[in-house]
Amino acid sequence: MDIPISSRDFRGLQLACVALGLVAGSIIIGISVSKAAAAMGGVFIGAAVLGLLILAYPFLKARFNLDHILPTIGSLRIHPHPGADHGEGRSSTNGNKEGARSSLSTVSRTLEKLKPGTRGAEEC
């Protein structure tokens, strides 16, 4: 049984649900004694904020042209820069390579000890 509802009524219901979630979450947090109850109030507030974002998305999309912004945000990549030389007398890239080799040799020695049938495995 489908009941027709106008877009204006639908937005009103969404806004009422958001307001109810905010009020309920605030009351639960305000009267809570335990941390678990306060967390439940936080869940109510989080759900209300999500509902508010869903409600406001069409307006934000039209106002800020999110179709243009969102692909740009999605293609952002973080490219870390090598750290500054700390006066050790060698470049940071060589230090990283030597550190990686040292770690690799440590892992290799540990794996050799764990192999069945080798002397290192019998000592453990």
UniProtKB/Swiss-Prot annotation:
Signal peptide: none
GO cellular component terms, A-Z: apical plasma membrane; ciliary basal body; cuticular plate; kinocilium; neuronal cell body
Membrane topology reported for the UniProt record: Multi-pass membrane protein
Region (Disordered): 80-124
Record's compositionally biased regions (Basic and acidic residues): 110-124
Main location: membrane
Positions of transmembrane segments: 13-33, 40-60
Keyword vocabulary terms for this entry: Membrane, Transmembrane, Transmembrane helix
Pfam families the UniProt entry points to: Kinocilin
Coiled-coil stretches noted in the UniProt entry, renumbered to this chain: none
Comp. bias (Polar residues): 90-109
InterPro entries to which the protein is assigned, alphabetical: Kinocilin
Localization per record: Membrane
Role description: May play a role in stabilizing dense microtubular networks or in vesicular trafficking.
Name of protein: Kinocilin
